[in-house]
From Swiss-Prot:
Keywords attached to this entry: Cytoplasm, Methyltransferase, S-adenosyl-L-methionine, Transferase
Single GO BP term: protein modification process
UniProt family annotation: Belongs to the methyltransferase superfamily. L-isoaspartyl/D-aspartyl protein methyltransferase family.
Function statement: Catalyzes the methyl esterification of L-isoaspartyl residues in peptides and proteins that result from spontaneous decomposition of normal L-aspartyl and L-asparaginyl residues. It plays a role in the repair and/or degradation of damaged proteins.
Protein name: Protein-L-isoaspartate O-methyltransferase
GO molecular function, one term: protein-L-isoaspartate (D-aspartate) O-methyltransferase activity
Top-level taxonomy: Bacteria, Pseudomonadati, Pseudomonadota, Alphaproteobacteria, Hyphomicrobiales
Species the sequence originates in: Methylorubrum extorquens (strain PA1)
Length: 228
């Protein structure tokens, strides 16, 4: 009897497609996520492709998971909340700071926006680039210090920061277009708040608080080439 070929990491399997649908309905819609583009993208992107093989069975759980070098893939609801807060339209130019395993960048790319992503850990960044390419998603990703943003690609319609800053980096604020949105967790461990800044003028920003969150810190510089 011929053997059955196992699906690759880049090919969603039926039971995991069902798990994605359950995740969207029970974790996102039930908590108030309404942006259809966000929901559709998170139904489509295989989260199991962005976690270590040993944790693939937990990919659709309601919480973060470790991805190596002290970093995590965020809880699905938090990813959805942050991306919904960006209020994106197709074709928008979006910068993600702290790309990690590449999952949020994949969701953004699936939504039809132009994605630029920065990751300070080379091992994570290179692995994320490979995953995104395997899924046929177009993301410009580089290894670097997220505090500096990506001046050569600026200005951006939206910036997503997937790590908590003690303050909001001025370089990121400067790289927003007029009416551009910056979503970032701010504060010390145990006291972080998710904020959205909307640029209303050269040096004028409107702020909205989305409540308490918990993220790894936004660090300066480029990380060591530790194995993932």
């Amino acid at each position: 009897m011929p053997g059955r070929t196992a699906p690759t990491r880049s090919e969603p399997v039926p039971d995991r497609a069902e798990a994605r649908t359950r995740m969207v309905e029970t974790q996102l819609v039930a908590r108030g996520i309404r942006d259809a583009a966000v929901l559709d993208a998170m139904r489509a992107v295989p989260r199991e492709a962005f976690v270590p093989d040993a944790l693939a069975g937990e990919a659709y759980g309601d919480g973060p998971l470790p991805i190596g070098v002290g970093q995590t893939i965020s809880q699905p609801y938090i990813v959805a909340l942050m991306i919904e807060a960006l209020a994106l339209r197709p074709g928008d130019r979006v910068l993600e700071v702290g790309a990690g395993c590449g999952y949020a960048a994949a969701v953004l790319a699936r939504m039809g926006v132009q994605v630029f992503a920065i990751e300070r850990h080379a091992a994570l960044g290179e692995a994320a680039r490979a995953r995104l390419a395997a899924l046929g998603l177009t993301v410009s990703l580089r290894i670097g210090d997220g505090h500096a943003g990506w001046p050569e690609a600026a200005p951006f319609d939206a910036i997503l920061v997937s790590a908590a800053g003690s303050t909001i980096p001025e370089a990121l604020k400067a790289q927003l277009k007029p009416r551009g949105r910056l979503v970032i967790p701010v504060g010390p461990p145990g006291g972080q708040t998710l904020l959205r800044l909307t640029r209303r003028g050269r040096d004028r920003f409107e702020s909205r608080d989305f409540g308490p969150v918990s993220f790894v810190p936004l660090l300066r510089g480029v990380g060591t080439a530790d194995p993932v």
